[in-house]
């Protein structure tokens, strides 16, 4: 079958349309049917995506499962995956059934809630499979709408503020990208991504407003794309929308925001910035390194000062994404492999940590750290799961969190030792805020009266965590499951990047060894 990617992209959207048209009423039966249809659809999508993985040939560095149909005005409906994107599709389809299962307690507008998540899944898969600039942009921007609604309708008391802040930040970042895409079409005469990857965008310096633009037109295009992807990651200092969005979003919204939506920024750097604008990427490398290093240290320190559990994990996400941008712009095999691995690992671990917060929020309806303490006495299973993912977040050897951080730091050490040393301090800081959070919430005596009747995790909640624990351990023990898939495509990307660098600057020469 050559249309597998279209099936997994549009199956959730078709299910959402069926749900909207044929599921009537707001009674308990309608809510139950909506949940089961969403769960069955997302599970089927995951199973079909496994066929893509099993039939994928990592040795082929080109795009596979390509679908190409003429659409409108020279724009094509073109889909495909390579070693860089295929695992992000799997991450999305893997997380969705678990997310739906975690929302089983939702009572308010259940049908609409499930529709929003199904549409969001289809749009997220579309981002990772689109091979046309216009198609990519449509998926990339449309994904804002269901998440905006999820936060704005089912979020906390400040949900309207948080949803608009999320929408405006990410949308404004993407306006520049749209302008850059139009410029690229005028230069290259096509919106086909595989063709654009081979197009040599001009990189000769020129004067603009009395200043020399180093990297020429490539730099202007790079900055436009960078604005969009940096907000999406998010990078410091354009990260301030994320803590608000996480705090106000319902648990399932936070899980998908952390596990998948943030990865669109990192994927964008790998798909567009490095291969299409290699000269500009080389010029920007030291600046991106230091922005990432500041993000790791600064947001880790900010995490230590939070009183809300979700805010601690949100700032932790910004710090961990700092390792990703470092690994990507190290532009060597080990760094880029590490960045992809870190994104996948962070998807499992951060998603699980938000689920951990959700478990006790469902019982106590507060995320304030001071409201808890001594939970291990009443919730031993929960305490064990929370401890496991806390350690994985810190980067304990044997978990996927260790592999991602280790590979990215190794890649950065080969390019800039000082930046790598600063980033390494983030490992110590992450242990500080993660263990501090765990100790305050679960350890000690159970003193508060309100906690003395709290119950441990239900079987449904345990089943949600089991696949996440399994993936975190499996990838931690055998990381080649990821690197064997990504390796050849990353090697080709790095080789093209190095060949495009003018007169091989020192950093690039070191990175190629």
Swiss-Prot record:
Belongs to the complex I subunit 4 family. NDH-1 is composed of at least 14 different subunits, Nqo1 to Nqo14. The complex has a L-shaped structure, with the hydrophobic arm (subunits Nqo7, Nqo8, Nqo10 to Nqo14) embedded in the inner membrane and the hydrophilic peripheral arm (subunits Nqo1 to Nqo6, Nqo9) protruding into the bacterial cytoplasm. The hydrophilic domain contains all the redox centers. It is a multi-pass membrane protein. Keywords: Cell inner membrane, Cell membrane, Membrane, NAD, Quinone, Translocase, Transmembrane, Transmembrane helix, Ubiquinone. The chain crosses the membrane at residues 3-23, 34-54, 81-101, 112-132, 133-153, 164-184, 211-231, 250-270, 277-297, 312-332, 340-360, 383-403, 418-438, 463-483. This is NADH-quinone oxidoreductase chain 13. Pfam families: Proton_antipo_M. Signal peptide: none annotated. One of its GO terms (molecular function) is ubiquinone binding. It catalyses: a quinone + NADH + 5 H(+)(in) = a quinol + NAD(+) + 4 H(+)(out). The keyword DNA-binding does not apply. Coiled coil: none annotated. InterPro entries: NADH_Q_OxRdtase_chainM/4 (IPR010227), NADH_UbQ_OxRdtase (IPR003918), ND/Mrp_TM (IPR001750). It comes from the Bacteria. NCBIfam families: NDH_I_M (TIGR01972), PRK05846.1-3 (NF004499), PRK05846.1-5 (NF004501). GO terms for cellular component: plasma membrane. GO terms for biological process: ATP synthesis coupled electron transport; electron transport coupled proton transport. It is found in: Cell inner membrane. Its EC number is 7.1.1.-. Its main location: membrane. NDH-1 shuttles electrons from NADH, via FMN and iron-sulfur (Fe-S) centers, to quinones in the respiratory chain. The immediate electron acceptor for the enzyme in this species is believed to be ubiquinone. Couples the redox reaction to proton translocation (for every two electrons transferred, four hydrogen ions are translocated across the cytoplasmic membrane), and thus conserves the redox energy in a proton gradient. The gene is nqo13.
